[in-house]
Amino acid sequence: MPAFSLNAYVALSAVLFALGGIGVLVRRSPLAILMCIELMLNAANLLFVAFGRAHGGYEGQIMAFLVITVAAAEVAIGLALTVLLFRRRAEVDVDRVNELKL
């Protein structure tokens, strides 16, 4: 099975990152924003692993593992804040939340 070239991985990663960035800017639901941030982080993971494979080292996989760990913490904190926001205000629209004090 032939492997894809590094350019294909870079292009796919750029497209995924751009889609995630557009989703963060356009969406108003905190859950959708979290999913788009996860898409952006996975695009970075793909790029790390692709460059690591192209250069024959394990550094890309180590960085991808680190990003996955940070993403798990980000999701846990983001979901906790979303649940807290919903309990306090009975809505989760990020446009209506303009102050940090709940």
Swiss-Prot record:
Key word Membrane present: yes
Transmembrane domains' residue ranges: 6-26, 31-51, 65-85
Entry's EC annotation: 7.1.1.-
Alphabetized InterPro entries for the sequence: NADH_UbQ_OxRdtase_chain4L/K, NUOK/Mnh_C1-like
UniProt-listed GO biological process terms: ATP synthesis coupled electron transport
Keywords, alphabetical: Cell membrane, Membrane, NAD, Quinone, Translocase, Transmembrane, Transmembrane helix, Transport
Domain of life: Bacteria
Gene Ontology MF, one: NADH:ubiquinone reductase (non-electrogenic) activity
Membrane topology: Multi-pass membrane protein
Keyword check for Membrane: yes
Name of a matching Pfam family: Oxidored_q2
GO cellular component: NADH dehydrogenase complex; plasma membrane
Residues in coiled coil: none
Catalytic activity: a quinone + NADH + 5 H(+)(in) = a quinol + NAD(+) + 4 H(+)(out)
Cellular localization per UniProt: Cell membrane
Subunit structure: NDH-1 is composed of 14 different subunits. Subunits NuoA, H, J, K, L, M, N constitute the membrane sector of the complex.
Its job: NDH-1 shuttles electrons from NADH, via FMN and iron-sulfur (Fe-S) centers, to quinones in the respiratory chain. The immediate electron acceptor for the enzyme in this species is believed to be a menaquinone. Couples the redox reaction to proton translocation (for every two electrons transferred, four hydrogen ions are translocated across the cytoplasmic membrane), and thus conserves the redox energy in a proton gradient.
Family indicated by similarity: Belongs to the complex I subunit 4L family.
The name this protein goes by in its record: NADH-quinone oxidoreductase subunit K 1
Source organism of this protein record: Symbiobacterium thermophilum (strain DSM 24528 / JCM 14929 / IAM 14863 / T)
Underlying gene: nuoK1
